[in-house]
Structures are given as structure tokens and as C-alpha cells.
Amino acid sequence: MTKENKPRDIVIVGAGVIGLTTAWILSDLGLAPRIKVIAKYTPEDRSVEYTSPWAGANFCSISATDDNALRWDKITYHRFAYLAKTRPEAGIRFADLRELWEYEPKHDKIRSWNTYVRDFKVIPEKDLPGECIYGHKATTFLINAPHYLNYMYKLLIEAGVEFEKKELSHIKETVEETPEASVVFNCTGLWASKLGGVEDPDVYPTRGHVVLVKAPHVTETRILNGKNSDTYIIPRPLNGGVICGGFMQPGNWDREIHPEDTLDILKRTSALMPELFHGKGPEGAEIIQECVGFRPSRKGGARVELDVVPGTSVPLVHDYGASGTGYQAGYGMALDSVMLALPKIKLA
């Protein structure tokens, strides 16, 4: 059997940022003609159930401080640096970050950042605004989430990856549909809580609400980790607007956009950056879109683990539960999942 007509024995379930990144890593190993991605949604779709396109998508201190989370961040930071330099068309660029806290920050994260994040600098206490007790500046990244997803999607199709739009009720359907499968990757995000054969009770939604506004003069990411709420301003590269947020509401499945929440976001973001709406406050906002999405959170952190498809001997690699860090930790997570799978994949 030639390389061109080998069976599609590598199955990835899910086409969010984690699933697509996993497929890209495998494709770079020359495995694209053997990859099938099964997903209810792909990057041209928009649904509250499909989280990845709604993300602010930047690199900040939101992620956890366990050893894996710190390592995944570092790996992904260097990956984004490479893409920003070599593939500007992917929708990733270097950007200034200013991050502030009204409470004690994660010192393990700060120590880790100080070893690799460019231009990292603690803001002097005298320069901190309001009730803030700590802040730092750094050079990190901005990602135009929908553009980046579409970039990966088109790249993978051109490389020979097959996409099948389908909603699975049980993970074993991957093997029933593709009996030649040598490995299955479970990159289903929030759906891991409901997918038969997985049904992870530790997975839960963290509701987010963001407002996309027109503000081409804004180039810096600014984040306030407040005592009562988190406020963030995240420009999207390639004239993609500016994401204003937000909310972190664990366990909340509400899909509705509430006008009072939009107003609250605009008030907080304009207070954090008065020049955002040219000093006019919420009344000066030029709204492009309002969005609600559900971050795929998990008690105990993300799951990157080798398992088997129930009732079979086919290896199953879980890679989900990144919550709001699917972009900034995603490449590291996907790389780990591929490393778990490689011994099960015949490369010749």
C-alpha cells in the first residue's frame, strides 16, 4: 500500500483550537493523508456551543500554575513567536501587554514568565492605578481567533486532512466508523462532559460574555484582575476589532446576551482605558458584535492522558479542559498528546 492510499487511521474528534492544533502537528510529521477530523462544528461555523471562535485569544497570566500549565504556556509562547515571525498571515502578532491586579497575583506564574517572556517588567507601585497592588508589562501575543482557526483549517485541507461534520453520541463511534483506526484523539472540550464513553463529571462551563468593538487605534492588551470582576481589552490582529470583556461565570449555561452585561463591560473597559472610546465612555462605543461562549473548564485542570476507546484496544488520547487557555496553552497540550500517541502510530 502506498503512502497516498493508506487508510485514515488517525482520528481526531473536535475541530476547536486544540483539535486543529493537534492535526497540524501530526500533519507536519507527514501524516495528513491518514488523518480524519470528526466534528459537529468547523471554523466556518458560529455557535455558542463552538467556543474557539469567540475567544479574545491572547497570552496573559490567566492560566494555572501547576507544572504542566507552566510548561504548556512556555512551549506555546515560543510557538507563537515562531508563527508571528514566519507566518504573519496566520493572524498572530507580537503585542504589548499591561496586566494589573487588585489582589495577590500567582507568584509561581510570574517567576516562570520572568525566565522567557520578552520585555517582562514589574510596574513600580507608585505607577499602579486605583486599588491595584501589583502589575507588570511584557511583550506577548494577540491572536485573531476566527482567522487563525480558518488558517489552520484551510492549511490542513490543502495538506490532505479529511474533515467530517458529524455529532457523535459515543466515542466508540469513531472506531465503528473507522475500523482501521490506530489512535483516537478526544479534543471535544466542553462536550467531554456529555460524550458517551467519556462523560467526565469534572468538566463544566465557565460562561463568558464579550463585546467586539471598532477601535483601530488600540494596539495594547490591557487586563485588570479585579476583586469582583476581570476586565480585559484585547485587540485582534488584521483589523479584527477589539474584544472587550468580560465575565467568568462557572457552571452557567445561559446562552442569552443581556444588555445590562454589555453596558457593564463597556463601563469597566472604558474606565480601564479611557482612550478606548475616545474619552466618551460607553456611549462612544461602536459595537460590531456581542458574543456569549462557554469556556471548557475542568476541576483539577486540563486532561492530557492516554486511555483506550471503551470496548476496544484502540488507544484514546484525551486532550481537553483548558478553560480559557486553549490558545495560550494549546500548542503545548497538543504536543503532549501527540507524544503520547506516537508509539501507537506507524510512521513508515
UniProtKB/Swiss-Prot annotation:
The keyword Oxidoreductase applies. Its main location: other. Keywords: FAD, Flavoprotein, Oxidoreductase, Peroxisome. It catalyses: a D-alpha-amino acid + O2 + H2O = a 2-oxocarboxylate + H2O2 + NH4(+); D-serine + O2 + H2O = 3-hydroxypyruvate + H2O2 + NH4(+); D-alanine + O2 + H2O = pyruvate + H2O2 + NH4(+); D-arginine + O2 + H2O = 5-guanidino-2-oxopentanoate + H2O2 + NH4(+). The lineage of its organism: Eukaryota, Fungi, Dikarya, Ascomycota, Taphrinomycotina. Catalyzes the oxidative deamination of D-amino acids with broad substrate specificity. Enables the organism to utilize D-amino acids as a source of nutrients. Gene3D superfamilies: D-Amino Acid Oxidase, subunit A, domain 2 (3.30.9.10), NAD(P)-binding Rossmann-like Domain (3.40.50.720). Anthranilate binds at residues 232, 295. This is D-amino-acid oxidase. It is found in: Peroxisome. Pfam families: DAO. FAD binds at residues 15, 18, 40, 52, 56, 58, 295, 323, 326-328. It comes from Schizosaccharomyces pombe (strain 972 / ATCC 24843) (Fission yeast). GO terms for molecular function: D-amino-acid oxidase activity; FAD binding; glycine oxidase activity. The keyword Ligase does not apply.
